[in-house]
């Protein structure tokens, strides 16, 4: 992801997105630079309108962020149901123990 972030930073500041600039940003951030990944990034971004891609991604991410609280509530409800089931199983096991006790 740091390679993408470097490209986005360069784009936002109006700098040219090329191998040298991406390497400089990554090195300044203290990241290890893999020349092959830098070249692949530059090649992949060659025909991409970064501004359009950022807008499209921001719009697509908004609904996902809104759905996150609902998912958290569902997970919490499932955890409560599991606890109730475990308690019922423990009570049933205790009752069976009385038969042999």
From Swiss-Prot:
Disulfide bonds: none annotated. Residues 61-72 have a biased composition (Low complexity). GO terms for cellular component: ribonucleoprotein complex; ribosome. One of its GO terms (molecular function) is structural constituent of ribosome. Residues 61-101 are annotated as: Disordered. CDD domains: Ribosomal_L12p. InterPro entries: P1/P2_N_sf, Ribosomal_P1/P2, Ribosomal_P1_arc. Residues 73-92 have a biased composition (Acidic residues). It holds the Pfam family Ribosomal_60s. The keyword Ribosomal protein applies. Belongs to the eukaryotic ribosomal protein P1/P2 family. This is Large ribosomal subunit protein P1. The gene is rpl12.
